[in-house]
């Protein structure tokens, strides 16, 4: 009888490369699976390295389009920002990666899935809750959480077992990147008083180094999602990639966040999210133009709840599904074009138009073209203030 098969979420880094050997020693045939969500890595190198370190099979999946349309799409429709600051960069990719791991496991006849998360972060929760939501029968193993090695012990194990040490191992920062942004933590950033060194940034110029002239872009939306950039129809993942470059050049999207983690601790995180910040601002601006007042005031309440659900690893929870369905309904009128000024760290919507616009210049103007019936205000004010007036008459004696 052969070894049991296990699918490992493989990144090509030291932790998951050592995990291949560690799991093999535990009696598993390791199938390495790498999901491309736009991190910009050399996927051929990762594919080959997995086999080099002992995986019996290496699978690389291009998930950029699905990640953008389904997961980032929900974040855009919902203007999602955890604690009003973090655009859910890593939190959005984890359910997709978990879904693909389950699909590979079922296709290959694996009985278990492994990931490279520590026992201290949010991602262990996100992966395991998602996997068990989709395939409760699969065992989940977290080698890094189990072996409790210091970095030096891990390197020693790698050297003893012929696992290549990555060239960038001395990088003082822990990095996670996808299409929607880049997360930076550890090193000197663990002291919240310290300023983030410039060498930590990859996507975004400093404000000082940003161009001295503004740049203007136009983003067209259809039912809440971008479909064109500067008049050119593009796939969503292509628009995000392009806006990352343009907005990053102008210093847009650096975030310094003291974050309340799901596991109960505070962490200090830096994020680079040029496209996320730019497109979220444009999207919200278009909603302001096309939403009735009641929807504009109520939707943010549910946005906050949905951001918390996704951050906390509950993408496949029925509550998340219901809230995303609500978002989809609201977005039917979010069609139009937003013009954005990019300059010295700011993404500022400066123009917008829509066939679903509820803005009436004839009602808003103070010129002779005004069609607003000001005489109607007298009766409106009387009825609107009646409960307050009655309260005063009864209680202010």
Curated annotation (Swiss-Prot):
Listed EC numbers: 6.3.4.5
Pathway involvement of the protein, from the record: Amino-acid biosynthesis; L-arginine biosynthesis; L-arginine from L-ornithine and carbamoyl phosphate: step 2/3
GO molecular function: argininosuccinate synthase activity; ATP binding
EC category: ligase
Enzymatic reactions: L-citrulline + L-aspartate + ATP = 2-(N(omega)-L-arginino)succinate + AMP + diphosphate + H(+)
Places the protein is found: Cytoplasm
Main location: cytoplasm
Binding annotation for L-citrulline: 86, 122, 126, 174, 259, 271
Positions of ATP binding: 9-17, 116
Keywords in alphabetical order: Amino-acid biosynthesis, Arginine biosynthesis, ATP-binding, Cytoplasm, Ligase, Nucleotide-binding
Domain of life where this protein originates: Bacteria
BP-aspect Gene Ontology terms: argininosuccinate metabolic process; L-arginine biosynthetic process; urea cycle
GO cellular component: cytoplasm
Family statement drawn from the similarity comment of this UniProt entry: Belongs to the argininosuccinate synthase family. Type 1 subfamily.
Matches recorded under NCBIfam families: argG (TIGR00032), PRK00509.1 (NF001770)
Quaternary structure note: Homotetramer.
Protein name as annotated: Argininosuccinate synthase
């Amino acid at each position: 009888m052969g070894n049991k098969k296990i699918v490992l979420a493989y990144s090509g880094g030291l932790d998951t490369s050592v995990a291949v050997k560690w799991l093999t020693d535990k009696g598993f045939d390791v199938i390495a699976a790498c999901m491309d969500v736009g991190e910009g890595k050399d996927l051929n190198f990762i594919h080959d390295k997995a086999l080099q370190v002992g995986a019996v099979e290496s699978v690389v999946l291009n998930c950029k389009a699905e990640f953008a349309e389904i997961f980032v799409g929900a974040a855009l429709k919902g203007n999602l920002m955890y604690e009003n600051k973090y655009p859910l960069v890593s939190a959005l990719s984890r359910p997709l990666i978990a879904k693909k791991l389950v699909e590979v496991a079922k296709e290959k006849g694996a009985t278990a899935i492994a990931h490279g998360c520590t026992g201290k972060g949010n991602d262990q929760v996100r992966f395991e809750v998602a996997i068990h939501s989709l395939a409760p029968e699969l065992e989940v193993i977290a080698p890094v959480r189990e072996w409790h090695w210091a970095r030096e012990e891990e390197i020693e194990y790698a050297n003893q077992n012929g696992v290549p040490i990555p060239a960038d191992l001395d990088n003082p920062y822990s990095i996670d990147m996808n299409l929607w942004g880049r997360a930076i933590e550890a090193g000197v950033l663990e002291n919240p008083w310290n300023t983030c060194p410039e060498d930590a940034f990859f996507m975004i110029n400093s404000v000082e180094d940003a161009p001295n002239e503004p740049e203007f872009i136009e983003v067209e939306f259809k039912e809440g999602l971008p479909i064109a950039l500067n008049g050119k129809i593009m796939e969503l993942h292509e628009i995000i990639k392009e806006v990352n470059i343009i907005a990053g050049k102008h210093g847009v999207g650096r975030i310094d966040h003291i974050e309340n983690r799901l596991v109960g601790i505070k962490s200090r995180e830096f994020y680079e999210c040029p496209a996320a910040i730019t497109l979220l601002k444009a999207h919200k601006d278009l909603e302001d133009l096309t939403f009735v007042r009641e929807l504009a005031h109520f939707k943010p309440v549910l946005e906050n709840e949905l951001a918390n659900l996704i951050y906390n690893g509950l993408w496949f929870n029925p509550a998340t599904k219901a809230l995303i369905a609500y978002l989809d309904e609201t977005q039917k009128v979010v069609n139009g074009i937003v013009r954005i000024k990019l300059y010295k760290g700011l993404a500022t919507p400066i123009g917008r138009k829509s066939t679903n616009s509820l803005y009436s210049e004839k009602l808003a103007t103070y010129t002779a073209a005004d069609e607003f019936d000001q005489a109607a205000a007298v009766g409106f004010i009387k009825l609107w203030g009646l409960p307050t007036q009655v309260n005063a008459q009864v209680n202010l004696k």
